[in-house]
Every structure is written in C-alpha cells, then in structure tokens.
Amino acid sequence: YEIASCLVGSEMCIRDRSAQRMKDVAKLITGDRKIVVLSAMSGTTNSLVEISDYLYKKNPDGANEIINKLAMKYMGHVEELYSTEEYKQKAKELIKSHFEYIRTFTKDLFTLFEEKVVLAQGELISTGMMNLYLNECGVKSVLIPALDYMRTDKNAEPDPVYIKEKLVKLLADNKDADLYITQGYICRNAYGEIDNLQRGGSDYSASLIGAAIGAEEIQIWTCLLYTSPSPRDKR
C-alpha cells in the first residue's frame, strides 16, 4: 500500500473553494492502491472550536448560530461537488446527520469529552463526502473509520499493536477496494472514548498507519505539494 495524507482545503489554501479542492484531491489520489488520510475541510475546525467555546460559556444560541452557518456552507459544497441528484441527496443526509448530532450538545453539560466529539465531526464529514464523490465517479473506494482502529493507550500515546491488529483486519475485510478513505487526527482513547492524537494531525495519523502495515511510501500533500517521509517517521 501507499499512504497519502491530504489537507482538504487547508488553511494554507484558504483561497481555494473547498468543493474544488476536494475534486483536486480526488484526482491526485486515484490510480495506485492507497490509503488516503483526510483532514477536515477549510475553516471547519475553527468553527467547531468556536461552537465549543460558546457551549463552555453556556451560550447555546451563539453555538447554534455558528452551527447553522457551517451547515449551510456544507450544503453549498454539495451543490458544487456532486453531479447527480442521487449523490447530492446522500451527501445532504450525511451532513444533516452530523449537524443534528452536534446540536444535541447544545442542550446538556459541556465538558472536554463533548468537545473532542464535536471536533471530530470535521474529519468525519470530509471523509464521508470524499468517499461519496469517489463512488459517484466510479472509483471503488471504501470508508475505513479511524475510530474503529486508531487508539491511544493510558498514557495518551498511540497503541501500535492495537492499531495494526484492527487496521489489518479492516483492510482484509475490504480487499476488493482500490482506495481506502480514513480520517486523520481523531482516535479513541484507552477507555473507548472519542479523542485525538493531540499533535501532527493527518500527517501523524498517516505515519502511524504506514508503520502499522509496512507501507511502501507515505505522501504528505499540502496545496499540491508533497513530501515522502519514511513509514516509521512519526513526526
């Protein structure tokens, strides 16, 4: 396998439209068999942090305003990204489900645990949208949820034995796919709670995945530029 870590409309590429950026990324990753590690779309993480800040301050109205703006932004991306009504509808349902989930956190006590769940939605949405787009284009891609294999131990360090065991099985269960789409940065902790790797973002996730499966190459793509660190280069 090759591993490709891609920033989808990264802050460095803020002038790019995120839907067009996703199309550009799709062109880059198709071809050889790859595991593709994606970030959240441009501006999404900042908005999710802003939502969390409002909820910490017990200001659900402020949070809902940002949620609604972000949801509308994604609905606009759907119209630009997909060409068929079937896939537009699938993408809208995906986005609706994630934002309805985010809204549930405006009603109860908000802690660090809830914040990590909210922040994870950016990567979950971007990978879901990318996988749908690739499927619409006729690419045999499969979504491999990072929350099903990426885990940290009780010291908040990656658990390489667990990662390898779970990831190898997931790949074997989907061996007919040409592309595997997964999330960067997010994981579960030793207690099964949604968490994050705290550093390195998608690049760090890509290195952990590469080390787990003995990848031939890891490509780190940012604004159409890339570097190729060793699979054991866990920056």
Please provide the spans of the model-predicted regions.
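N-terminally biased helix-coil "hinge/interface" segments that flank
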Residues: 82-83, 91-93, 123-131, 139, ...
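N-terminal glycine-/serine-/threonine-rich phosphate-binding loop
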Residues: 10-35
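Active-site phosphate/oxyanion-binding loops
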Residues: 145-177, 183-228
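Structural motif
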Residues: 11, 33-36, 117, 140-142, ...
